[in-house]
Amino acid sequence: MAYRESFYRYLMTQRDADSSDEIAQFANNAQHDLTFPKQEQDYEKLSDYLELNASYLPSMYIFDRAYRMYEDKMMY
């Protein structure tokens, strides 16, 4: 079985403090979320966590887009 990095680790590659991009802002804010499930890969578990705890995420659509990008990267 091939190694698959966590969603958090992927998300951290999207950080950019100078960007107004929604995914970059999500990544910037997630970096400061001390309880973010950093080892998680599962969409449902991440989605549940964010819906309940991530007041910094204005729309779950942003997470959905970021997760699709993560899945695309993990295919290669």
Curated annotation (Swiss-Prot):
Gene3D superfamilies: YozE SAM-like. InterPro entries: UPF0346, YozE_SAM-like, YozE_SAM-like_sf. It holds the Pfam family YozE_SAM_like. HAMAP family: UPF0346. Belongs to the UPF0346 family. This is UPF0346 protein lhv_1069. It comes from Lactobacillus helveticus (strain DPC 4571).
